[in-house]
């Protein structure tokens, strides 16, 4: 394997000049720089990353932790983050915690020992446990929270306006004539709590009764939980005519359950998701509350870059606005359609 001395010998220059080119230091002529770059290419020279980090006091490496790579929301956000850091010549290391504290600790320690200069974390349960927080704070590197709802006061964060997004979704269903609206979400989830807040506020704003028996929480936000919870809701009386789901993945499970029961969508039941990760790739296409995933990733990466460049201000929390995307999985409630057909005023609010 070629060394920096081999590059210097091939270029006919000093080791100091080669080092200056590698570290983007000023004072090297364009002719000398081209000689060094040509020698590097001919020798396939690859600088020792650790040595460079020590000499420059910088590794140009950041880390990002997500709770799941199966949930399509997170890969889309990761791509946005990675694009920003690539443009700024940083390497992005990705860790999948699976929502587990031990995995979070392993990745934090590994990334920091591997010279990560900063971290982006999701504001999910495992990242806010005492031992994890202690490791993050003792690391003395900038940390930015992204998505999730468990804001950590010491760190910058980019979060969605979950209550408003849920309010808009449920209010839309109410305007379609739905009175019995179910909700499926996740136990011990702060995001579920905030989306339930918006759900309840919309019902209150319309003067409708909150029916706790139509609210069901599962153990995870996976498709299987959406399927199981929807099956259970179908046995409730009154049976809901619309269902608001914690995310699109759970909504896919709900769609499967309804198809299995031969319940027509949206004629007999409307389905509405949240995050807009799968809305265009199912049948019928899913009405969903879209989160600006690319924007969220860009903002989080930009916040971290600012900290890496020395920005020293109090932690900043940026709240992004969701947007309701109307597709084919929602429609008027049956009684609402009958009133419209008769030419009567069907508005509830």
What kind of region is each of these model predictions?
Residues 87-88, 139, 204-210, 235-239, ...:
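Short helix-capping segments at alpha-helix termini
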Residues 15-20, 54-70, 172, 180-186:
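Short beta-strand segments enriched in small/hydrophobic residues
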């Amino acid at each position: 394997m070629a060394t920096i001395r081999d590059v210097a010998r091939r270029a006919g220059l000093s080791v100091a000049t080669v080092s200056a080119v590698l570290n983007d230091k000023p004072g090297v002529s364009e002719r000398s720089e081209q000689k060094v770059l040509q020698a590097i290419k001919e020798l396939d020279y690859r600088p020792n990353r650790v040595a460079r980090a020590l000499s420059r006091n910088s590794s140009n490496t950041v880390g990002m932790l997500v709770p799941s790579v199966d949930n399509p929301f997170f890969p889309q956000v990761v791509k946005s983050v990675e694009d920003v850091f690539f443009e700024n010549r940083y390497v992005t290391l990705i860790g999948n915690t699976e929502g587990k504290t031990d995995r979070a600790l392993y990745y934090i320690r590994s990334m920091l020992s591997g010279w990560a200069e900063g971290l982006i974390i999701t504001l999910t349960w495992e990242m806010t446990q005492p031992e994890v927080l202690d490791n993050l704070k003792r690391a003395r590197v900038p940390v930015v929270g992204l998505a999730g709802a468990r804001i950590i006061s010491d760190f910058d964060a980019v979060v969605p306006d979950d209550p408003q997004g849920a309010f808009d979704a449920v209010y839309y269903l109410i305007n379609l004539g739905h009175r019995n609206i179910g909700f499926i979400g996740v136990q011990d989830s702060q995001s579920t709590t905030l989306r339930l807040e918006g759900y309840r506020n919309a019902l209150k704003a319309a003067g409708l009764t909150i029916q706790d028996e139509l609210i069901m929480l599962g153990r995870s936000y996976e498709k299987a939980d959406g399927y199981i919870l929807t099956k259970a809701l179908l046995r409730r009386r009154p049976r809901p005519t619309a269902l608001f789901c914690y995310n699109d993945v759970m909504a896919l499970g709900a769609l499967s359950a309804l198809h299995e029961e031969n319940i027509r969508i949206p004629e007999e039941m409307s389905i509405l998701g949240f995050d807009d990760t799968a809305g265009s790739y199912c049948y019928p296409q899913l009405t969903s509350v879209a989160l600006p995933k690319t924007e969220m990733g860009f903002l989080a990466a930009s916040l971290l870059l600012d900290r890496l460049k020395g920005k020293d201000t109090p932690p900043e929390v940026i709240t992004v606005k969701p947007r309701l995307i109307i597709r084919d999985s929602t429609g008027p409630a049956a009684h609402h359609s009958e009133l419209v057909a008769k030419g009567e005023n069907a508005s509830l609010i």
